[in-house]
Structures are given as C-alpha cells and as structure tokens.
C-alpha cells in the first residue's frame, strides 16, 4: 500500500520471502535466485498474501500448480511466467536495481504515484471503473508544476 514505488532485488532463495517480493511493484532477480511457495510441503497454506498475489501475477492455473506442488522455480522460469520483471547476473543486480530506481525517480513523482494508484485500484474493479479512476487521476496531474514543466520540455 506504499505510495512510493517499491523494487525488490532477489539474489538467492525467495521461499518464505516470495510473499515479500510479490508485494513489491517491480521484482528484479539475479540468475541464481529461486522462487517458490513450499508451504503445502510443511502442512500449511501460503500466508501473507501468497495465494492472492501469486494468482494476480502469474494467473490462476500457474499459481495453482506452484502452490499445490510446492515447486521451487529458477529465476528464468519466474521471468517467463511473469513473477519477476527481469533477470540479471548476480554481480550487477544491485547496480541494475539502482539504475531502474534512478530512472523512476527522475520522473514526476506525483504522476508516478497516481499511475501506481490507477494500476492498483483498477486491478480490483471492472475496466470501466478503472478507466474512470485513471481519468480522475490524469485530471489531477494538470494542476501540477511537474506537468507544466513536462509539457514545455517535451516540445
């Protein structure tokens, strides 16, 4: 629920920590990272949003397979199914995450915040309501200094 963009850098096992990574807006993994929801092998269900976030990120069929089997997957598979945004070599993971954070930080922060809000709220409703949310937030941007500067610099 943070208003700021949160980026996860995963460099190793994300099993119990998979829920934490899934709660982030963007997930960058090193090639040695592994992901899973192994709770069923321990006789419990995934907690802390694991069943809900995984389903939203990878789809119901893949989430069921991963949760019901307790399977651990490698970073490249996690990228393929949409669990992580990208995979990089372990020695440049932090550098790549910092680069991405700097790119995001250079943008108008209110617009980034409103974009995140539109995505989050829109995902919880039908498309028409989502478009209404987006439209309202879009309109709020027009009264900002950032928007006026952005339009001038775009020319």
Swiss-Prot record:
Q: So what does this thing catalyse?
A: a short-chain (3S)-3-hydroxyacyl-CoA = a short-chain (2E)-enoyl-CoA + H2O
Supply the InterPro entries for this chain. ClpP/crotonase-like_dom_sf, Enoyl-CoA_hydra/iso, Enoyl-CoA_hydra_C
Q: Which Pfam families does the annotation name?
A: ECH_1
Q: Which CDD domains match?
A: crotonase-like
User: Keyword Translocase, does the record have it?
Assistant: no
Q: Which domain of life is it from?
A: Bacteria
Which pathway does it take part in? Lipid metabolism; butanoate metabolism
- Which GO molecular function annotations are given, in alphabetical order? lyase activity
Q: Which family does it belong to?
A: Belongs to the enoyl-CoA hydratase/isomerase family.
Q: What name has this protein been given in UniProt?
A: Short-chain-enoyl-CoA hydratase
- The species this protein belongs to is Clostridioides difficile (Peptoclostridium difficile)
Q: Lineage of the source organism? A: Bacteria, Bacillati, Bacillota, Clostridia, Peptostreptococcales
């Amino acid at each position: 629920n943070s208003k700021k963009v949160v980026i996860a850098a995963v460099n190793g096992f994300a099993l119990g920590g998979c829920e934490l990574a899934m709660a982030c807006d963007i997930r960058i993994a090193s090639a040695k990272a592994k992901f899973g929801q192994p709770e069923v092998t321990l006789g419990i269900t995934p907690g802390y949003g694991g069943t809900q976030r995984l389903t939203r990120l990878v789809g119901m069929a893949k989430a069921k397979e991963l949760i019901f089997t307790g399977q651990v997957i490698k970073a490249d598979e996690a990228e393929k199914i949409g669990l992580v945004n990208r995979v990089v070599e372990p020695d440049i993971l932090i550098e790549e995450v910092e680069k991405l954070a700097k790119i995001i930080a250079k943008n108008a922060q209110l617009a980034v915040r409103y974009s995140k809000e539109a995505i989050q709220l829109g995902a919880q409703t039908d498309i028409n309501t989502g478009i209404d949310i987006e439209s309202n937030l879009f309109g709020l941007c027009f009264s900002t200094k950032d928007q006026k500067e952005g339009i001038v610099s775009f020319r």
